[in-house]
Amino acid sequence: MIPKELQSRLAGHGITTCDEIALREALEARVETYTLIRLASWPARRWKCRYRLLIGDTMHDAQSAAEAYALGLLAVLG
């Protein structure tokens, strides 16, 4: 589950289904390549995130894969 703020921002772009698979598919439709990294426990504690999404030269830190995909989508959509 992603935060309500991200859900409302995505809805503004016409994305209303906010589960991990739907968000991943929406991101894949808009970007050619990306990398999702699940961080080990010590970097997760240090950076206070569990996932890191890399798109080009940008980086998005998140607590869940779905949140990472949502942040990436919002960055791509502007």
Report each predicted region and the residues it spans.
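N-terminal segment of the canonical double-stranded RNA-binding domain
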Residues: 1-63, 67, 74, 78
